[in-house]
Amino acid sequence: MSDVALKRNSSFFRAKARLTLLKRRDGGVISRSLEHRRSSRRRSSVSAPTRRVSGTLAKLGADDRRQFFDAFFRMTAVSPEETVSLLRSMTVPVIQQENISLPYDINAKFAPGDCISLSEMGYTLEMGGCCSLCSYGWSTTTPPELPALELAFMHHLSSVVEFKELVTSLRVCAGNSIVGNGAYENEGLLRMIKHLLEQSTLFYAYYTVKGGVSHDFRVLISEDGGGDGGSPAYAMYFVFKPGSPLHLGAKLIRQLIFNCPGYKWHADVHEGAFLLVVTRDRCSAIPEPRRVKLDPEDVYRRYCDVLVTEEKVHDYSRLYSTFSTYCPPASRREQTAAPATAKQV
């Protein structure tokens, strides 16, 4: 062995012996501090640029971040090899939770794969692929696809099997029966059914939510301005149990958006209860689909024959009273914009 190699080995062993002695004498305090400084230097040298970038992204809004990542992935898609090497070197995940506020416009801020979690601890938006609730199916079942939905809609709307909750709500909204002996007759219900059949998308919305959410909910109907041809337009509220958390899965949100063209969806909270609100989008040029042809008289007769308990009627009467002052988010926005427009004129 050469003299240089011997010197290096002897220096190494002397340093090692010195370090061992320091460990024994000081209880490893010095060695831990040295190791801490080394690890902190490694972290600062490796991840400082990453921290700067992630900090900048955190300051951006949701729309700006979406545009940034859209341009970023378009650029990296040009070269798959560089994309793979870049992803391997990343230390900060691209996907993360995002806090939102209510009311939340689902249509305007929807991106495929988004899911929404609402609870008393806060409201968050995240990717369904990274969401444990979506992965394990904790809060949602798989909603039906559109072809199956159309067939089920036509069948169940006539047979009232899946629409009993909605029937109860419609009867309470229309008013008390004009006949006695336990039977139900009300011309107001017939008028509501005629107008609602012109908004068949609301029935699609009800069936989609019922098939895609495992949480119990109540459904309310409310007039929301004028519709086509001077007939009243209706909004539908899906009210969930007060104080209970709500998770809207990525698959469900996708179905709500694509099964209901020309309608707007909002997540909101009222009197401690989370709710989904679906209203006609007055700015949309998409006409109401006319795929389903049902006789209003036939549907009315079937709805009148449904047995509704007094307890259920009382629950819905109380709920309608609670929401008598509630204004849908879309209407609130229009009311806020109207004075501003008037001032400009």
Swiss-Prot record:
A zinc finger (CCCH-type) spans 115-247. GO terms for biological process: viral budding from nuclear membrane. It is found in: Host nucleus inner membrane. InterPro entries: Herpes_UL31 (IPR021152). Keywords: Host membrane, Host nucleus, Membrane, Metal-binding, Phosphoprotein, Zinc, Zinc-finger. Transmembrane segments: none annotated. The keyword Oxidoreductase does not apply. Phosphorylated at serine residues in the N-terminus. This phosphorylation regulates the localization within the inner nuclear membrane. GO terms for molecular function: zinc ion binding. Its main location: host cell. GO terms for cellular component: host cell nuclear inner membrane; membrane. Plays an essential role in virion nuclear egress, the first step of virion release from infected cell. Within the host nucleus, NEC1 interacts with the newly formed capsid through the vertexes and directs it to the inner nuclear membrane by associating with NEC2. Induces the budding of the capsid at the inner nuclear membrane as well as its envelopment into the perinuclear space. Forms a heterohexameric complex with NEC2. Interacts with capsid vertex specific component 2/CVC2; this interaction directs the capsid to the host inner nuclear membrane to initiate budding. Belongs to the herpesviridae NEC1 protein family. HAMAP family: HSV_NEC1 (MF_04023). This is Nuclear egress protein 1.
